[in-house]
């Protein structure tokens, strides 16, 4: 399992490549008292999420307050669908949309092309 090493390497890269002060990694679950103290959250293995109704409510509140969620570590269509269904519970009024290669966000620091995206079936 890559946790917590992958998380730590990811946040170290953010610190190294941007002007964002990341601070020390802080691992916790949704609902932990520290949850709303972080404006940016990196969640891994969300294809295994089984969020309770309370966790769904808290994640919704977090996002609607302006919190930023980055997710990672999907293995195939089944895990993607688990995450998608979870997010439908969190934000039922919103749809997920794919970010195209031409979107400016794909070219802020690096030029990310479709060929660079990693998808594991």
What are these regions (language model features)?
Residues 40-80:
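Short alpha-beta junction capping motif
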Residues 5-13, 54, 58, 78, ...:
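Extracytoplasmic/secreted proteins, especially bacterial periplasmic and envelope-associated proteins
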Residues 15-19, 64, 88-92:
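Sec-exported extracytoplasmic/periplasmic mature domains
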Residues 26, 30, 57-59, 85, ...:
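Generic preference for flexible, low-structure residues
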Residues 1-40, 44-48:
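Aromatic-Pro/Gly-enriched surface loop or interdomain linker
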Residues 20-30, 71-76, 94-102:
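Surface-exposed patches in mature extracellular/periplasmic domains of secreted proteins
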Residues 78-121:
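An acidic, glycine-rich "communication" segment
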């Amino acid at each position: 399992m890559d946790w917590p090493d992958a998380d730590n390497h990811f946040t170290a890269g953010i610190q190294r490549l941007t002007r964002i002060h990341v601070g020390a990694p802080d691992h916790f679950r949704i609902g932990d008292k520290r949850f709303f103290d972080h404006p940016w959250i990196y969640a891994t293995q969300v294809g295994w999420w089984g969020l309770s109704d309370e966790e769904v409510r808290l994640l919704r509140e977090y996002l609607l307050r302006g919190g930023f969620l980055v997710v990672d570590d999907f293995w195939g269509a089944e895990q993607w669908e688990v995450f998608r269904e979870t997010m439908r519970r969190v934000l039922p009024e919103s749809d997920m949309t794919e970010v195209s290669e031409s979107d400016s966000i794909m070219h802020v620091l690096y030029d990310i092309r479709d060929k660079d995206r990693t998808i594991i079936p």
